[in-house]
A protein has these predicted regions:
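A short acidic/histidine/glycine-rich donor-binding loop in glycosyltransferase catalytic cores
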Residues: 295-303
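A charged, aromatic-enriched C-terminal amphipathic alpha-helix characteristic of glycosyltransferases
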Residues: 316-350
């Protein structure tokens, strides 16, 4: 099967890495995967193609904006690939009623915006696939985990970089500010003399974007002055192929997920990617949801507003215990989320 992804490809975004993983494993199962477009010099390992006739399936991967090709390319794709050969992946929960959590994170700002998304999806395909472990809410919806885990990518501690940070967070400030302010910052403030370097790597932690059309300002809302008071470092994002190595430079990595996707029980690549690193992942997730993804051992890695201090300080004091917990989670991921299973699920969904 020849599978062409149509998506906004960015070197510092998880979904580009996820599709790159499929490119790597697809030949083992007799498939070929590429992203629509022309080769980019800064992404040399990504397979690009604009030869639509070479592909028999197309996957439209949507995030938080309706990504459109040029009219000529869009017409070529639709003209060469029948409706039954098109798949939609709804990564950011747009194919849902308007959801607004505590006046903060939301999938749509207005009902009119939601209608535009629904109409666009329905024009392309009969079904909408979602990377969720929640049951479908309607006849057009199909759960498809999509993201997978490859034990071969785990970092060998012997080859890992030196641990120069106590705590690291790798990811953009896109609806993450409240969780960080509520869960992590009080712990750092109370224990600053006991905690070493803390760094946030990603966009918009030091300041929100200034370019027009960046999105709802609430998505970037954050007390950046708190970072200065607590001597927390910031750094621009790294390329997707540097993420695991970067995370391995810290004793602890904090995992956060934007609230609306957590509410919808959507998975993201970071759920799996963080366990490739030589680090202790601590997860700002609902404990039952985490156990459903990672197995029961993950309950020992959960951070809550009330329990974050005890967990973080214990992980710094007893790293070997937490490394054993991480190994339990890795074994669960290898058994239940391997790419052989993921590739089979994707191929089956494209054939159905």
């Amino acid at each position: 099967m020849n599978i062409l992804f149509v998506m906004k490809h960015r070197g510092n975004a998880g979904n580009t890495h996820a599709v790159a993983d499929y490119m790597r494993v697809a030949p083992q199962f007799g498939h070929r995967v590429a992203i629509f477009g022309r080769a980019l010099p800064w992404l040399p390992e990504i397979n690009f193609s604009d030869q639509v006739r070479e592909f028999d399936k197309v996957v439209y991967l949507f995030e938080s904006e309706i990504y459109r090709l040029s009219p000529v390319n869009e017409t070529t794709l639709i003209g060469n690939l029948a409706r039954k050969d098109r798949m939609i992946l709804d990564m950011d929960g747009m194919y849902n009623p308007v959801i607004c959590l505590d006046g903060y994170d939301r999938n749509h700002d207005t009902e009119e915006e939601r209608v535009q998304w629904i109409e666009h999806y329905h024009a392309l395909a009969d079904h909408v696939h979602k990377p969720t472990i929640a049951p479908p809410a309607g006849s057009r919806e199909v759960p498809l985990t999509f993201y997978g885990y490859d034990p071969a990518l785990e970092t060998d501690p012997k080859n890992a970089p030196e641990k120069i940070y106590d705590i690291l967070h790798v990811g953009h400030n896109w609806w993450r500010g409240r969780d960080i302010e509520k869960v992590l910052l009080p712990v750092v403030a109370k224990n600053r003399s006991k905690i070493g370097r803390v760094r946030f790597i990603g966009l918009w932690w030091d300041k929100p974007p200034t370019e027009p059309g960046s999105g709802n300002p609430l998505a970037f809302a954050f007390d950046s002055e708190a970072f200065k008071r607590l001597d927390i470092e910031t750094q621009d994002s790294v390329m997707y192929d540097e993420v695991v190595q970067t995370m391995s430079m810290a004793k602890i990595n904090i995992f956060t997920q934007r609230p609306v996707l957590h509410h919808l029980r959507h998975l993201t690549l970071k759920y799996f990617e963080i366990f490739y690193a030589d680090t202790i992942p601590l997860l700002v997730l609902d404990a039952d949801h985490a156990a459903d993804v990672y197995g029961p051992a993950a309950r020992e890695l959960i951070l809550t507003a009330g329990g974050a201090e005890e967990r973080i300080m214990d992980a710094l004091a007893r790293p070997e215990h937490y490394r054993e917990v991480v190994q339990d989670v890795r074994r669960h991921l290898a058994r239940h989320h391997g790419y052989e299973q993921r590739m089979s699920e994707l191929a089956a969904a494209l054939k159905s």
